[in-house]
Amino acid sequence: MKKLISTIIILSLSTLAITAQTYRMENKHLARIIQVTDRRLHTQTILNKQAQTELTPTSCDEFSLRFSIPGETENTDYILSAKDFIVTSVSPYANPERPESKGYQFQLRGKENDFSLIVYYELASNDAFCRKSLRFTSNQDILLKRVNV
């Protein structure tokens, strides 16, 4: 019985340790490590190889969307950020307009709304910067006022 309980505890602890997946994009200038933890998307680390510095974002949103719903009371803006979405899938991404860029696409779904979002990260072999873009879909009419990435 003690052996069974020990096995269950070990399996539980190892399951907790596997809840984060990391995705790395890298070239000679920089590396960006993106992490999905408990189905939430965030940048874990950005490494500037030329300056030999490492940035670990601690209190910034991966993105934010400010919008309103037409017909609602004026000055009724909503703001959603990465914490309001869960990651439903991840796949490698190659931008057809920039074949030299490689990266990942993260599909997200709103936790408490009917919004969906695809976040694209891409890095070309000679770029000293990483590109991030969003594709936002809503099942209701909204007025998108501001996007921060």
Where do the PLM segments sit?
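Residue-level detector of intrinsically disordered/flexible regions characterized by low predicted structural confidence
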Residues: 4-5, 34, 134
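Sec-dependent N-terminal signal peptides
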Residues: 4-15
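A periodicity- and composition-biased signal for non-globular, repetitive helical segments
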Residues: 8-9, 38, 138
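A general, composition-driven signal for non-globular sequence regions
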Residues: 15, 26, 125-126
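Sec/Tat signal peptide C-region and signal peptidase I cleavage site
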Residues: 16-20
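Acidic-aromatic substrate-binding/catalytic surfaces of carbohydrate-active enzymes
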Residues: 21-107, 111-113, 120
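Acidic, contiguous internal or C-terminal segments within carbohydrate-active enzymes
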Residues: 104-149
